[in-house]
Structure formats: C-alpha cells, structure tokens
C-alpha cells in the first residue's frame, strides 16, 4: 500500500510500508495527507490526471509530469456535507478559519507553500445557503 512517509511541499510522499495510508494506489508524492486518510480527502483521479472533481482534489502544474495537490478537508466540513470554496484549495499548510464551509470564495487569493490561501476577512462570511450568520 502507498503510505505517507517523508514530507514534500507540506504533504507526505507515498511509499510502501507504514500505517498512515491515504490512497492504496497513489504514486504521486502530493496525493497523501498527514492526518486525513479517508477516501474523501484524497482522490485517485488526482494522482492519475492532475485534476479530480469533487471533494479532495485541487489542480497544480508540474514539470516533467502531472502533479496535483490534495485540498485539505476539515472533519467538520465533511460532517456538514460540503467542503472548500473552489479558490481555497491550493495551499501547503493546514486550512485556516477561512477555508471552512463558511468561507466566501470571492475573498480568496492564490497561495504558496507555507502560506495561508485566504485573507482573514473571509472568515466572517458565508457561502452556503444554510449559513445565516458569521461563525468566526
């Protein structure tokens, strides 16, 4: 099984052995997450094509081959049945308050490794119809 081992750009690489498995068939170094090993957090299509629809996948270009970062998905997001706004996915760090389902996609900006992907102002706006008031 492909398991999480050494870190690469904030995400662990996939290697054989160990117990922190994310995707059994994952071969790309960016397709595993250190603390979230559920299927909904790491899509097989992410490893295969560089872009996966639905919860768990973002898109990132790579030289010499396809690379894909897995978007972080908070446990409470999964319980709510939703995940992250489309522009809040490219980050090499755990999600901030902004990246919860209460975040407003229009507030987000691109990010780089080690930086948060969203502005603090995102935190107090809602993007889901069921959200009636700020939660931060």
Swiss-Prot record:
GO terms for cellular component: cytosol; keratin filament. Sequence repeats lie at residues 3-7, 21-25, 31-35, 36-40, 41-45, 46-50, 87-91, 97-101, 107-111, 117-121, 126-130. It holds the Pfam family Keratin_B2. Residues 21-130 are annotated as: 11 X 5 AA repeats of C-C-[AEQVR]-[ALPTV]-[AGHST]. The keyword Repeat applies. Keywords: Keratin, Repeat. InterPro entries: KAP (IPR002494). It comes from the Eukaryota. The keyword Thylakoid does not apply. Transmembrane segments: none annotated. In the hair cortex, hair keratin intermediate filaments are embedded in an interfilamentous matrix, consisting of hair keratin-associated proteins (KRTAP), which are essential for the formation of a rigid and resistant hair shaft through their extensive disulfide bond cross-linking with abundant cysteine residues of hair keratins. The matrix proteins include the high-sulfur and high-glycine-tyrosine keratins. Belongs to the KRTAP type 9 family. Interacts with hair keratins. This is Keratin-associated protein 9-3. It comes from Mus musculus (Mouse).
